[in-house]
């Protein structure tokens, strides 16, 4: 998520690369005296500077945001992930039915605190049958399991850690086959685990490699009846090796040792294979393994896809529902859509109040569509068959209506442009 700069035009990875190059140039060109002083060794006394003081200024958003959304139709509750670090990452639980209000609504329950180990929680899946909630954290590379009744600063009942690469984005529970599906962005991968996993369990299957077409995968949905996997892709692509990114000590395949106690077999960084592809939805066989090609792809200018994120399926029409972050819209595609095809309907416009929608879910019991709108701190509820520029039926807010947009998400670097007197921050 990049400020409210147009995300599809300014890629965070590209901005980070520019900032890195700028920093190197400054260090080598502008401050040669620093380098000489360091080389002087004994000639220059070294001191440790401890900055134990509050900041002079703080640029931060203290309000929670909604990143992912999942609904327990039986209990009438909606679970939403807040990945905003400045407000304290959390999982917030609300009733699905409430009187319309513009006031900030307090959750029924909140899972948050150091014992939860949820980090930058990006995805949620529910199993009402087993009373379990599954959450993934992008920064920690963990899959946590909580009771659906959990509240407060509670540790997960189970945790899968040390196997999953960092930068996870989406999680889906295929209840029919008792399997969890997880997407990982930077290594372009889908991993499948047993729902009843134990710590350090290996994935049952992975989808990863140059043939897959995965390019910065985010949202994931499994149609257990058609035996198909749907994945949304932002389009940031590089060649990957099947199995790359697993954190398994000396047997690991990785391109960096960052964050690994035992880096394993480090693959070469260059030459670069990276490129920007159009955003897409790729579809695979549910049982695919290794480096398979997708069975079909939705991609092209007519699709209107622009940073597609959360994905689900309409249980009545079978349509595929996409949270289209880049242009503040919700797109609906036919179940078997393929190629450069337009959506069958679109939810978009000022009346919708959507700003940076990232999560979608359907409440089957009430025929309602829920949308997590990241930028403006709201979750909006619409009729399931909504189309066009339509106002939501009701809204959950975590900030006043006139609060500034959330803008900043996962900050990867910071630089100062002295010429323009501006701070550059890629998210």
PLM region spans:
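Short, conserved, GDST-rich strand-edge loop motifs in beta-rich repeat architectures
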Residues: 232-276, 382
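Sequence/structural signature of beta-propeller modules
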Residues: 2-49, 256-269, 274-277
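Conserved beta-strand positions in repeat-built beta-propeller and related beta-rich domains
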Residues: 71-73, 80-87, 126-128, 133-141, ...
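Short loop/turn segments immediately following beta-strands, especially the blade-tip
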Residues: 94-102, 145-153, 192-200, 283-291, ...
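A short helix->beta-strand "capping" segment at the edge of beta-propeller domains
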Residues: 40-63, 104-108, 291-296, 344
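Structural motif
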Residues: 87-93, 142-145, 189-193, 239-245, ...
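Beta-rich, blade/repeat-based domains predominating
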Residues: 61-74, 114-130, 162-179, 211-225, ...
